[in-house]
C-alpha cells in the first residue's frame, strides 16, 4: 500500500518570532510552497506564514 498523500507541514511566521502553525496539505494537488496570512500572537498582528518542513 502507498504512503499517505497528505503530508504534515509547518507554517512559520515571517515576523521572526519563532511562532508556527502545523497543518497538512496534499502534495500531489499543490506541489508549490504554501504561503498564507495568519495571526501571530507574539506580535499581536496578522503576518505572512510560509511553509517549512517538520523536523
From Swiss-Prot:
One of its GO terms (biological process) is translation. Pfam families: Ribosomal_L33. InterPro entries: Ribosomal_bL33, Ribosomal_bL33_CS, Ribosomal_bL33_sf, Ribosomal_zn-bd. The keyword Ribosomal protein applies. The keyword Cell division does not apply. It comes from the Bacteria. GO terms for molecular function: structural constituent of ribosome. One of its GO terms (cellular component) is cytosolic large ribosomal subunit. Keywords: Ribonucleoprotein, Ribosomal protein. Belongs to the bacterial ribosomal protein bL33 family. PANTHER family: 54S RIBOSOMAL PROTEIN L39, MITOCHONDRIAL, LARGE RIBOSOMAL SUBUNIT PROTEIN BL33M. This is Large ribosomal subunit protein bL33. It comes from Alcanivorax borkumensis (strain ATCC 700651 / DSM 11573 / NCIMB 13689 / SK2).
Amino acid at each position: 500500500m502507498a504512503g499517505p498523500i497528505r503530508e504534515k507541514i509547518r507554517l512559520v511566521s515571517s515576523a521572526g518570532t519563532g511562532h508556527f502553525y502545523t497543518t497538512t496539505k496534499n502534495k500531489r494537488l499543490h506541489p508549490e510552497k504554501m504561503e498564507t496570512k495568519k495571526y501571530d500572537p507574539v506580535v499581536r498582528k496578522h503576518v505572512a506564514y510560509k511553509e517549512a518542513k517538520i523536523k
